[in-house]
Structures are given as structure tokens and as C-alpha cells.
């Protein structure tokens, strides 16, 4: 384990308990984004935007926070990090109060995630202070009807078109630590290069209570 692994893992255990990652069989995940990829994961599709989302939408465990560390990269253009806080989102009041967004949606996952079940939960709910929180990713919902499908499309459009998204290059060795209930994160598409390589470390977990 390198120094960046140790620092990220140390931070994780200072703030809570890391979740077991079924995709890797460990309490963290390290993965590469490269020029060519044959997996079923959007995370590894270099030349496609990774739209704004939260983590843990398709698992039974709570996901309070996420740590993302850039381990290394070569021949990279583009691929900037994108984040959005719910309080800065122009359409929060409208969509978080839509009754459809408070219905249970079915959430599944591709084979690479190694999760052999599906879960149900709403997109929007409230925290203990009555503030809206979100659990959403555009790749995994299985709408039960047209009403839910149209809501998901409206939600996706409203997030991606937000003028308050923050886009920035994350230097190698840097870490993003975010609350998973009101920070959404994503990534811009990379510029094509045959030697493209980026390695990331991800840890997800729950706060101490």
C-alpha cells in the first residue's frame, strides 16, 4: 500500500467506518480509466461524460461519505472533476418537492459491481433537520412506469444543465472528501489519446454516530 493509500485510508477511519466494496472485495477500490475499455462500467468510459450522481444508490449499506483520490495519470486532457451542492442547484425546490421523486424507485447494477440484488428507495428524502437529500445515479434506476421515467429525464437534464456546477482539474495526489447526501459528483469526458491512463482510489462509508 503506497503513501496515498495510507493517507486516504487513515482519513476514512478518522471520520467513520468504510463500507466493504463488493466490486473489489476490499474496503476500498482502485481502478484505471484508459483509452480502451471493455467493462460495463461508465466509470471507465473515458470519452463519455460521467454525469452528476451520488454513490451507493444500488446497495443496502448506507453511504454517508465518499473519498476520491487521484493516484496517477498520463497523457490526460480533459477529464475534469465536476461537483454540485444541492443548495446551489437552481431546481432543488421544484424537483425535491415533486411527489414522484419521493416514490420508491428500483435500483440495480451491472455485473461488474458484483451485487446480486436490487434495492428500492426514493430519489429525494429529508434529513433529520427536514432538509432535502438525494440518492441518485442516472445509470441504474429501473422506472416502474412512464411517470417515473419522465421524472428521471427531467432530473438528469436539470442537473447537467445547472449553471452552478463547479468544474476543476484535480491534481495528482489530491483528494475529494464529500458528504454523499448533498454533494453530487461527476467527470467531464477526456480528450482522446491512445496512451491515456488515470488511476483512482475510492473509499465509501458511514460516519460515526
Per-segment meaning from a language model:
Residues 16-26:
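Short secondary-structure capping/junction motifs at helix and strand boundaries
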Residues 30-177, 181-209:
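Active-site environment of non-heme Fe oxygenases that use a 2-His-1-carboxylate facial triad
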Residues 7-15:
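His/Glu-rich zincin catalytic helix
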Residues 14-18, 71-74:
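Mid-sequence acidic-hydrophobic segments that form the walls
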Residues 1-3:
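Short, small-residue-biased leader/transition segments that mark boundaries at the very start
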Amino acid at each position: 500500500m503506497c503513501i496515498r493509500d495510507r493517507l486516504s485510508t487513515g482519513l476514512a477511519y478518522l471520520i467513520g467506518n468504510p463500507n466493504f466494496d463488493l466490486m473489489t472485495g476490499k474496503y476500498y477500490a482502485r481502478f484505471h480509466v484508459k483509452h480502451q475499455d471493455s467493462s460495463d462500467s461508465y466509470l471507465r468510459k473515458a470519452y463519455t461524460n460521467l454525469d452528476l450522481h451520488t454513490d451507493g444508490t444500488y446497495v443496502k449499506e448506507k453511504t454517508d461519505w465518499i473519498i476520491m483520490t487521484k493516484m496517477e495519470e498520463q497523457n490526460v486532457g480533459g477529464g475534469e472533476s465536476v461537483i454540485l451542492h444541492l443548495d446551489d442547484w437552481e431546481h432543488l425546490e421544484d424537483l425535491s418537492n415533486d411527489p414522484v421523486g419521493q416514490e420508491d424507485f428500483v435500483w440495480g447494477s451491472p455485473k461488474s459491481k458484483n451485487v446480486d440484488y436490487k434495492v428500492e428507495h426514493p430519489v429525494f428524502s429529508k434529513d433529520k433537520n427536514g432538509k432535502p437529500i438525494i440518492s441518485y445515479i442516472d445509470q441504474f434506476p429501473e422506472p416502474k412506469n412512464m411517470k417515473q421515467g419522465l421524472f428521471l429525464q427531467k432530473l438528469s437534464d436539470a442537473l447537467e444543465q445547472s449553471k452552478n456546477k463547479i468544474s476543476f482539474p484535480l491534481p495528482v495526489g489530491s483528494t475529494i472528501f464529500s458528504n454523499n447526501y448533498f454533494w453530487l459528483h461527476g467527470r467531464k469526458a477526456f480528450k482522446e489519446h491512445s496512451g491515456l491512463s488515470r488511476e483512482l482510489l475510492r473509499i465509501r462509508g458511514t460516519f460515526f454516530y
